[in-house]
Structure formats: structure tokens, C-alpha cells
């Protein structure tokens, strides 16, 4: 029995209690929202991760870190270093490897990760088909489904399943005047398979069996957005919305079967359209968790897309997004280094909290209030210890040596907090004031 079925029966499990304690909300509310599909526990029940990661309504915004090899760069040691970065800064981790021994790489990443690990199974079967049959679209439906099952057996907790795109949508998108017809790698693979084989989406054709597999492991289906906009000029066109409508129907069928499901979102979206993108998705799907790639509000930001997209991510988080998929400085340019992975993860950690201050209110802002209290007292030790990156903060604080006065090296003796504390002491000691 999966966690949704348990919640629908009114049961309160140890996992629900753990979520309640972690997030600071009543356990009955956790149970009820799980039963409605509004809270998911990202896990593979047979191979639970070391970190508990719930996402959904009323919970803190979580951050996903993408790593993985490419056909150009296969360096497992580097990817395992990225896992360490993800363990420190992230909540979930996706292995998007497309180069090397994909089975071995995935298993090593899962072993090294404290976090639930996700994959895109069509990558593997497409690449294997390309190598063995001289064409990526030559794989069979059974081979795709067997790959999904293999990933589940390895302990994968969630998978991007591009089931929303139909053959008709794919053909029309490719013939359209979209700036970039398809930017999703997995979505493009499924589209190519449908056109090559003149057949409907293999995930859709075998949807009931896909649900059975995920139900067995109580893992999470992440419904991919194959037709997400890859340019701000393509945002919210008929193809993105058409796929979302198909996805919403799949969400309902998954929840009816007691299968955990979330929906993936764009992408490239102008700043003024981000909030209503979230509202539209939540309305169409009944409020299941939303997993969004930023979004990027501009297309010209590389090599600073981690900054540009964090702006969009803060707005999407504040508007109700539950899981943010980070971008790195290498986005749109190449495979990220370990350092670039860290830069992206930190930017998104900041964006997630900025959104939570709006979405969760005082519960999230307590952290900021505590830092501000110590800052006002010039209590550097306590203030720095509470910051998002204490180690880096201390390095900056001491980069010109230890300040000669109680203030920092920016204001020195002219620090307003130092002056204010002195005036408070004078007011307190004067009987005439």
C-alpha cells in the first residue's frame, strides 16, 4: 500500500509524523494533503534515501540539483564531487548522464547521495538504441518500460516521464513558427520516436502499466513538459498549454490509482507571466506539486543564467511552486564544473527561501529576523553562524583582516548600528531625556 492509499484510509504513519515535525505543520493536515495529492514524499519505498524530502502545499520550497555526464565529458569522479555539493545544498538530485556506462554511473550516484535521486529513463534506452541499432528511435515500447523498471529497482525515487506530449502536438510544434520548436532533450526523444514509428506516445499507450510500476515502489512520477518554452517568446503558446491539458488528465488518473505524481514546468517565461503560470497549473491539476526549471525571465543571461533564473525562481516559489530545478552558470553553454554546480545550488537556495518568506510568512521569516537581530547588535559571531553560507561569509568579513572596530570594514567607525547603540546607552543614562 502506498502513502496516498494510507492517507485516504485515514492512517497516520511514522513518515507523516516525520513530515509534520520537519515542516512544523499538524500531522492531520499532512495526511489530508497527501490523500488529495497536494503533498508528495519523494522516495522509493524499497530504497529510501537518507534525507526525508516532502514537497507540496504549506511546505518549504525544495531545490533539485542536476548532475551527470555527457557524450563529450565522462568523468565519474567529477560527478561524485557534484553529489557532495548536492548533499550540502540540495534536497533532490537528478542523474542526467548521457555518456559512459549509464547503469554503473547511476548506481554509484545513488550510493553516494543522501538525497532522493531522479532520472529520465528515455535517455538511456534512446542512447543504447542509437549505439546498437544505429538509430535512437529504434527502441521498442517494451525496452522503454524495462528501462523504467530497471531504474526503479536500482532505487530511483522519481523519474521524468514525458507522457503529456502527443504525436499530433509534436508534429504541429515542429511545423510551427515557434522560435525553438522543442528544447526538452527527453521530450525530443519521445517526439522523434513517435514520428519515426508513426505511433502514439509509448508512455501514454502503456500508462496503466507505468502506474503499476511506480505504485509498487511508491515512487514519484514527474510528468515532463516536452513542449516547454525554450525562449520567452514561446511562453504560454498553444503547444505548452496543449501539453499541460493532457498532463492534467494524466495527473487525475495517477491519483485515482494512488500513485504519487508531480508536474514539471518551464523553462523561459517573462517575469510578468510567472505567477499566473503557477496558478494555471495548480488550477488544472488540482494543486499537485509543481517542479519548475527557474523559470528564466530572459534569454540573454548566459553565463549568468543561475542569477537570471533565480529571479524567476523566487517569484515562482512565492507563487506556489514546490520544487525548484536549479540552473548553473554553464546553462546553455556546456557541462557545469563542480564549482558551477555549487554556484547554481546556492543561488536557488536563496531563491527558495525568498519565495518561502512570501508563501509561508512568519514561519520562514524567523530565520531572517534572527540574523537581523544579531546584525543590529553587531554580534558578528552569531550573525555569521546563522547565514546561508557561514564559511564564505566569514571569509568576506575578514578579507582585509579583522576590523579595528566592532563594525565591519565597510563603514568602520561610521557604522550606523554602532552609533545607534551608543545613543541608546546615552539616552538610558540621562535623566533629562
UniProtKB/Swiss-Prot annotation:
KW GTP-binding (keyword) present: no
Catalytic activity: 5-amino-1-(5-phospho-beta-D-ribosyl)imidazole + S-adenosyl-L-methionine = 4-amino-2-methyl-5-(phosphooxymethyl)pyrimidine + CO + 5'-deoxyadenosine + formate + L-methionine + 3 H(+)
Cofactor note text: Binds 1 [4Fe-4S] cluster per subunit. The cluster is coordinated with 3 cysteines and an exchangeable S-adenosyl-L-methionine.
Pfam family, one: ThiC_Rad_SAM
Binding site for [4Fe-4S] cluster: 408, 411, 415
Enzyme Commission designation: 4.1.99.17
Keywords: 4Fe-4S, Iron, Iron-sulfur, Lyase, Metal-binding, S-adenosyl-L-methionine, Thiamine biosynthesis, Zinc
Keyword Heme attached: no
HAMAP family: ThiC
Protein name as annotated: Phosphomethylpyrimidine synthase 2
Higher taxonomy: Archaea, Thermoproteota, Thermoprotei, Sulfolobales, Sulfolobaceae
Amino acid at each position: 500500500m502506498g502513502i496516498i492509499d494510507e492517507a485516504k484510509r485515514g492512517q497516520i504513519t511514522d513518515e507523516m509524523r516525520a513530515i509534520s515535525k520537519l515542516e512544523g505543520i499538524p500531522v492531520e493536515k499532512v495526511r489530508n494533503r497527501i490523500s488529495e495529492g497536494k503533498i508528495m514524499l519523494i522516495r522509493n519505498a524499497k530504497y529510501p534515501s537518507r534525507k526525508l524530502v516532502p514537497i507540496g502545499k504549506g511546505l518549504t520550497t525544495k531545490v533539485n540539483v542536476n548532475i551527470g555526464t555527457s557524450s563529450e565529458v565522462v568523468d565519474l569522479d567529477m560527478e561524485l564531487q557534484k553529489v557532495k555539493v548536492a548533499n550540502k545544498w540540495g534536497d533532490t538530485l537528478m542523474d542526467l548522464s548521457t555518456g559512459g556506462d549509464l547503469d554503473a554511473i547511476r548506481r554509484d550516484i545513488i550510493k553516494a547521495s543522501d538525497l532522493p535521486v531522479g532520472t529520465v529513463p528515455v535517455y538511456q534506452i534512446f542512447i543504447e538504441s542509437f549505439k546498437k541499432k544505429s538509430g535512437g528511435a529504434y527502441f521498442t515500447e517494451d525496452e522503454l518500460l524495462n528501462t523504467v523498471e530497471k531504474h526503479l529497482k536500482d532505487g530511483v525515487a522519481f523519474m521524468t516521464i514525458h507522457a503529456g506530449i502527443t504525436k499530433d502536438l509534436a508534429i504541429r510544434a515542429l511545423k510551427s513558427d515557434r522560435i525553438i520548436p522543442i528544447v526538452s532533450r527527453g521530450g525530443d526523444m519521445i517526439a522523434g520516436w513517435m514520428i519515426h514509428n508513426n505511433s502514439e506516445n509509448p508512455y501514454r499507450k502503456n500508462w496503466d502499466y507505468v502506474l503499476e510500476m511506480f505504485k509498487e515502489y511508491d515512487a514519484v512520477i514527474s510528468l515532463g513538459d516536452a513542449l516547454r518554452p525554450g525562449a520567452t517568446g514561446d511562453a504560454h503558446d498553444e503547444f505548452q498549454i496543449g501539453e499541460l491539458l493532457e498532463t492534467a488528465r494524466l495527473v487525475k488518473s495517477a491519483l485515482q490509482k494512488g500513485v504519487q505524481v508531480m508536474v514539471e514546468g518551464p523553462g523561459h517565461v517573462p517575469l510578468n507571466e510567472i505567477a499566473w503560470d503557477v496558478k494555471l497549473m495548480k488550477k488544472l491539476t488540482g494543486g499537485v506539486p509543481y517542479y519548475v526549471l527557474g523559470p528564466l525571465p530572459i534569454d540573454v543571461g548566459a553565463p549568468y543564467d543561475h542569477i537570471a533564473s533565480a529571479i524567476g525562481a523566487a517569484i515562482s516559489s512565492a507563487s506556489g511552486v514546490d520544487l525548484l530545478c536549479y540552473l548553473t552558470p554553464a546553462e546553455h553553454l556546456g557541462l557545469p564544473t563542480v564549482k558551477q554546480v555549487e554556484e547554481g545550488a546556492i543561488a536557488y537556495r536563496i531563491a527558495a527561501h525568498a519565495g518561502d518568506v512570501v508563501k509561508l510568512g512568519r514561519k520562514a521569516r524567523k530565520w531572517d529576523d534572527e540574523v537581523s537581530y544579531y546584525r543590529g547588535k553587531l554580534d558578528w559571531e552569531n550573525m555569521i553562524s546563522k547565514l546561508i553560507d557561514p564559511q564564505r561569509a566569514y571569509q568576506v568579513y575578514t578579507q582585509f583582516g579583522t576590523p579595528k572596530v566592532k563594525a565591519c570594514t565597510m563603514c568602520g567607525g561610521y557604522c550606523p548600528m554602532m552609533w545607534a547603540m551608543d545613543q541608546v546607552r546615552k539616552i538610558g543614562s540621562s535623566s533629562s531625556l
